[in-house]
């Protein structure tokens, strides 16, 4: 009986000792955790590494957020039934998406500015990276949202039989020019290559498409069926070439109609303004990108109408206008995506650099 009692007591003693050891180990671990990467009390009860891990996750979210937003915003494709103001709404919506990406970046900075660490080197570095990125996104947003009123209730490139061409609103034409130029210039500052206009003339080989420029007559019709020629000019260049030709214009080109024969130096903005003498527009030396850019602007900007002839030429003319606008939209979308990608990658790099573990004494 005594042996059994003694054995039970020994087992209890061993159990008690094991519990004491476990408790001591647990207390030691808690002490180590509390001291890891600085006092937990200074970071709202979380260790600094936990805070930084959260910041890192937010940076990843910021990097992918814009691309995740793209599918339901980018990719607008104009048809013969699309109204000009719908394209304006698209630009405004895209600006709003940039605003959301900027808001998410702001959350990254706020999460790094925890109590006791707001003025610390890590939070300061992250705040600087975020503010730099937000400045660029804000600039793009302003340019895009300024295009909200680019159009009216007319259909893109709308044309009727024997329709006289009408120059677009001078103010809106200038506004579109400044916004597109602002987007391209901002992209260039972020390492995105500027689009190039190319040297293709309206006469390509034996195909003389110069009469296609007559759709840009103002206060006059095209004089003959030239929709197919206009379509050929638009198909000869890319959207990037059209955009390059537009932003290479001078704002003053929108002030007055073309009063002399078009040359290789005649800008897209001047072609969009057009002129009363269709023959002065239709010159072999004219650059295809400038004419196509002019067709896109005339088709899209408030008040603008393309000139057409009869026998269904109006349908071909509108088709050329729609194609030109679609090409231009794709070019603008491409530059926006590349710019945002570069901006967020740069911000993420700076944030990760700030988050990286530092050697003792650094």
UniProtKB/Swiss-Prot annotation:
Pfam hit, one: Lipoprotein_2
Record-linked InterPro entries: Borrelia_lipo
Classification via PROSITE patterns: PROKAR_LIPOPROTEIN
Entry-linked SUPFAM superfamilies: Variable surface antigen VlsE (SSF74748)
Covalent lipid sites (S-diacylglycerol cysteine): 27
Coiled coil regions in record: none
N-palmitoyl cysteine lipid modification positions: 27
Main location: membrane
Membrane topology according to the record: Lipid-anchor
Subcellular location: Cell outer membrane
Protein's UniProt keywords contain Cell inner membrane: no
Keyword set, alphabetical order: Cell outer membrane, Lipoprotein, Membrane, Palmitate, Plasmid, Signal
Entry keyword annotation includes Signal: yes
Domain of life: Bacteria
Stretch forming the signal peptide: 1-26
GO cellular component: a single term: cell outer membrane
Annotated function: The Vlp and Vsp proteins are antigenically distinct proteins, only one vlp or vsp gene is transcriptionally active at any one time. Switching between these genes is a mechanism of host immune response evasion.
Recorded family membership: Belongs to the variable large protein (Vlp) family. Alpha subfamily.
Note: Genes for both Vlp and Vsp families are on (usually) unnamed linear plasmids in B.hermsii HS1.
Protein name stated in the entry: Variable large protein 25
Native source organism of the sequence: Borrelia hermsii
